[in-house]
Each structure stands twice: as C-alpha cells, then as structure tokens.
Amino acid sequence: MENEIIKERFLGTIFGQAVGDALGLSTEFMSKQEVDRFYPNGIEDYSQIVQDDHRRRWQRGDWTDDTDMMLCILDSFVACQKVDILDIARRFKEWMMNGGMGIGRHTYNVMALGDYTSNPQKAAEIIWKMGKKKAAANGAVIHFKFVLNVCLYHFLKLN
C-alpha cells in the first residue's frame, strides 16, 4: 500500500474518532427510548444535541475523554516512536490532573493511586480487586483500535 494512502487512512481514524465521539456524546448514557424521543429523525448536526445535565458540561461539538485519551496515546507514540505504557500512563495522569473532562469513576480511581505512573497495570488490578472484580469498564476496547492502527502504520511505514 502506498505511504500516502496509509497516511490518509491513519488520519481518517483520528478525525473519525473525534467527530464520531463528539456526535456520540449526543446519546451517551441515554436509553433507546430517550434517544427515540430526543432524536426521532436522527442527528446530523452538533446544534441538535440536547443540553441535559450530562451534555451541558461540554460545548456542542466537543469530544469526550475517549478522544482526549486517544490523543494522549498518539502524543506518546510520536514522542517515543513506540508504544510505551509508562509514558502513556504519565500522559493520562497529566490529562486527569488538568481537568480530565468526562473521566469515569473507575478510571479516576486507577489513575489516582500513588504508583499508577510507575505501574499502571498493578494499579488497575488493585482497583479491580477492591471492586470485587465486578468492574467492566470498556475504555480499553475504545483505545485498543487506535493503538492497533498506530502499530500497523508504523509497521507498514518500515516495510
């Protein structure tokens, strides 16, 4: 595959994440019935986003923590030229300490542990065990696709 095509597809995943996340905020935490009531004809523009207690925390068109954290991963990869878990953890923690808009309780609890930046996996395990192994946050799934794209882009660029 030509480098320019790879670059365009890679950038497309970044823009797609941000735009999709900003539009997805319109229905985040809503039931199907609420979505049907507030958006009977779907949603085509940020101006249509209902301003309830959850959504009014963001300006219309803003993305959520999902894109912020994806950008932390991207910044880390650009700086380190590899997937560096400790650098990503440091960037996540810095983002959290500077507002961390939309951060979930489980993610906050993991990052708030004192040794999170030196051992993020252990911090996550501690919080998971403290919650009796019932937490099922899915943020890792959201970010995995981007990490996979970063690795694929890097691999194809080298070959």
Named regions from a protein language model:
Residues 1-159:
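Structured, active/binding-site neighborhoods that engage oxygen-rich ligands
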